[in-house]
Amino acid sequence: GLSFLVETEKSRILFDFGAGKAAYDNACKLNIGMENIQYAVGSHGHYDHAGGYPEFVKEGLHCPLYTGTGYFEEKYARDGRKATYLGCGFNEAWMQEQGLEHRICDGYLKLESGCYLVGNFERTHDFEQIPDRFVRRLDDQWIKDDFSDEICMVLDGEEGQTVIVGCSHPGILNILTTVQKRFDKPIRAVFGGTHLVEADAGRIRATLEQMKQMGVGLI
């Protein structure tokens, strides 16, 4: 998992929250007060990116939470008959109890000038497949998780755009291609997880080559 603090000219944005208390402890060491964070963004509903959110809330984070659709769905990893819960550990009802506002990015949402959330990624690269073990529980049935809840953040810059991703379950190239089509601007840098841990050498080479063709110079 991960947790980034992104500072723009206008705001501080907390992008993902880690799995537990560690990300909040890091914020304390950096003397970052929760009252000084204007936006909280959840890339997707897995525990290692979302599980630390309640800790931030307990310590005073009360800005709106921005996520994709389906962030609170029950997510699991299945291995035969064994299913391991991977979800965020809280839900919409808990948000309401805490008096927190939840805002949905349904494909595109502008946070502020030069800062955007993007989701609903086109699946244009066939070799970027989601492992079958990732599933959701819906109406007492197991359904393959397509990670339609995943979103990324895009920042404008003088030399091009910076894309911040959480885990890239839908495929890093699918994400970047969708971003390029929406904005028609060069992508200068990519920060975050690419989920290539299980990829073979051929897929990694193909991914890097296509990212270079897109103009990405910093990963």
Which positions does each model-derived feature cover?
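Active-site-proximal loop/helix segment associated with metal-binding centers of metalloenzymes
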Residues: 81-90, 95, 107-158
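Active-site metal-binding motif and surrounding structural segment of the metallo-beta-lactamase
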Residues: 22-67, 72, 183-189
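Pre-active-site segment of Zn-dependent metallo-hydrolases
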Residues: 10-39, 129, 134-136, 172-173, ...
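Conserved beta-strand hairpin/beta-sheet module of binuclear metal-dependent hydrolase folds
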Residues: 1-30, 146-164
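Active-site metal-binding loops of divalent metal-dependent hydrolases
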Residues: 17-20, 45, 69-71, 115, ...
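Hydrophobic alpha-helical segments and helix pairs
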Residues: 62-106
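Cap/insert and terminal regions of metallo-dependent hydrolase folds
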Residues: 45-49, 64, 143-152, 156-219
